[in-house]
Amino acid sequence: MRDTMEILRTENIVKYFGEFKALDGVSISVNKGDVTLIIGPNGSGKSTLINVITGFLKADEGRVYFENKDITNKEPAELYHYGIVRTFQTPQPLKEMTVLENLLIGEINPGESPLNSLFYKKWIPKEEEMVEKAFKILEFLKLSHLYDRKAGELSGGQMKLVEIGRALMTNPKMIVMDEPIAGVAPGLAHDIFNHVLELKAKGITFLIIEHRLDIVLNYIDHLYVMFNGQIIAEGRGEEEIKNVLSDPKVVEIYIGE
């Protein structure tokens, strides 16, 4: 019987780049309100998998389901309407615009990078309700004092928080995050994951790729390990996750990296 808490699942996802099989029958399940982490060496297929899930790549075989609806190969902008949003390893703020404007721009072309919003200067919404919502999100992220700062003047970690803020403007059910603390100082990295836990408590689900296990392990509920385009290990809960990370085959691929 399928887990009634499941919000996302993939079934036997296959993705080719030419003759190279980047994903080889990948099946995962993500429960509602969980923080699920995918790890693996570079080139193991992690980014390809989340690109398929979020519509930035098309699967060659297999299906993706969200809340039991088939969302396979839908465009990112379509997935916004299902409540799925994505943050990127390299933040993509509009650097000439303020922090506040960057949050408001997400309401124009939801599900797309703001860099694709050709008419953003003309169409930035100024309705009081949207501005109030943006300020509440900035306060939550401890960025309200920077609301009028140009995004190009922010630190890398602050830009990552702006990415999260833009995602929150869409009232997401699930946020898919690609290395949210890459290159971020440890203190701010913990701040970011503390925000993740606060959002989890509000019912938001997270699917995350991240290499910095020393920081993230205390924040996750579910772990998948990928290698050569396949899931090679899985653990749910603290004890199972510890067992996975001490598994000789998992240790070997990380030592070999």
Swiss-Prot record:
Q: Which UniProt keywords apply?
A: Amino-acid transport, ATP-binding, Nucleotide-binding, Transport
Cleavable signal peptide:
none
Q: Which GO terms describe its molecular function?
A: ATP binding; ATP hydrolysis activity
Q: Which GO terms describe its biological process?
A: amino acid transport
- Report the PROSITE patterns cross-referenced here: ABC_TRANSPORTER_1, ABC_TRANSPORTER_2
Q: Which residues form a coiled coil?
A: none
InterPro entries named among the record's database cross-references: AAA+_ATPase, ABC_AA/LPS_Transport, ABC_transporter-like_ATP-bd, ABC_transporter-like_CS, P-loop_NTPase
> What are the record's GO terms for cellular component?
plasma membrane
The cross-references to SUPFAM superfamilies, in alphabetical order and at most eight, read:
P-loop containing nucleoside triphosphate hydrolases
Q: Which sites bind ATP?
A: 40-47
Q: Where does the source fall among the domains of life?
A: Archaea
Annotated ABC transporter domain ranges read 8-253
Cross-referenced Pfam families, in alphabetical order?
ABC_tran
Concerning its family, UniProt says: Belongs to the ABC transporter superfamily.
Subunit (UniProt): Monomer.
Briefly, what is this protein's role?
Probable component of a branched-chain amino-acid transport system.
Q: What is this protein called?
A: Probable branched-chain amino acid transport ATP-binding protein LivG
Q: Which organism is it from?
A: Methanocaldococcus jannaschii (strain ATCC 43067 / DSM 2661 / JAL-1 / JCM 10045 / NBRC 100440)
